[in-house]
């Protein structure tokens, strides 16, 4: 038996996102988002599922916070529905939307759970998408207005802020690969979107400082780790592109003032350029306090000229996989956290990490041993990095609840709490009770 003791101030938590859990998509003045439009379009989401009701957390947040309290977590990462605050993207504020988040944040604080707020987790107001979305620089100022409104409203109530969740998904998965809303397939648009959201990030950080908002602010990329299939230079380069597009494309401009040149050149060969205007890089480089890291898996990659715009193909090496098909390899988390040290020994929070395991309720229980094993393996790697001297400050398990898993609909379950989407009955899984013990003890026990 081995005990892995965590620092006394380590922030144990869990995470969700607004569109995935709230539901109430037409209630109390909320406008439509690109995910409403996308999910309501036949063929875009598995089984025609949508987030109209989701986990109904808009009406059941008190029950969900009670379950968090019983879990013993110190922090809860949630996101704000932009169209719930600004139904048209900008202009007039919807007070009922603000009131809802005040109720949530106040109840979290009353229960000793620190709110960890993500401003943008993919639900762009449809009205802005109709005008070009993140491909239009107008959206930058609309986002800053939204961010400033949140900073003013929740100053003193929220101490941890993230501007954007997984910018790679916002830019490339959604606008180049077309898998997520708005479902576009244009490389230049994807690069425009990525740059504009970084400018919006920088301007929001600047406004955060100008307003004297309490707490810390950062951004949460979904990082990737890949190892080459062979020792060939082509395979090594394919891996470098995979890693760098997820991590460096969005962090290097913030920390070093430039995009990775080898990727700039790679995209230029495909006819796409970064739309940098005067002053953009200074804005993007506004100092941040921390970063959130979302990590799920690593891959083995090789060069394949037919494998998409990166020409990097993932190879099945026979590793165990979760039910969504992602290989389980916790070493990648350790490697990528060390890789990011080139930007300095910055404060890092693991803002998402978890496994899709589709176990069902049997005799009132969900015995999700594979999820427990996954979390245990990854927490060992988190402990290793802390022991190495890295400033990893917290871990937020994805997710509190089974929820609407984007293009997979309700077909894939990541929660530590099972949700029956017909009845909305919540059933804590064995992973919930296992994690509760880890949080309570502040240490992890493994058998070797």
UniProtKB/Swiss-Prot annotation:
The active site is at residues 166, 352. One of its GO terms (biological process) is cellulose catabolic process. Its EC number is 3.2.1.21. InterPro entries: Glyco_hydro_1, Glyco_hydro_1_AS, Glyco_hydro_1_beta-glucosidase, Glyco_hydro_1_N_CS, Glycoside_hydrolase_SF. It comes from the Bacteria. BglA is intracellular and cleaves cellobiose probably through inorganic phosphate mediated hydrolysis. The keyword Metal-binding does not apply. Belongs to the glycosyl hydrolase 1 family. This is Beta-glucosidase A. One of its GO terms (molecular function) is beta-glucosidase activity. It catalyses: Hydrolysis of terminal, non-reducing beta-D-glucosyl residues with release of beta-D-glucose. The keyword Hydrolase applies. It is an enzyme of class 3 (hydrolase). Pfam families: Glyco_hydro_1 (PF00232). Keywords: Carbohydrate metabolism, Cellulose degradation, Glycosidase, Hydrolase, Polysaccharide degradation. One of its GO terms (cellular component) is cytosol. Gene3D superfamilies: Glycosidases. Homooctamer. It comes from Paenibacillus polymyxa (Bacillus polymyxa).
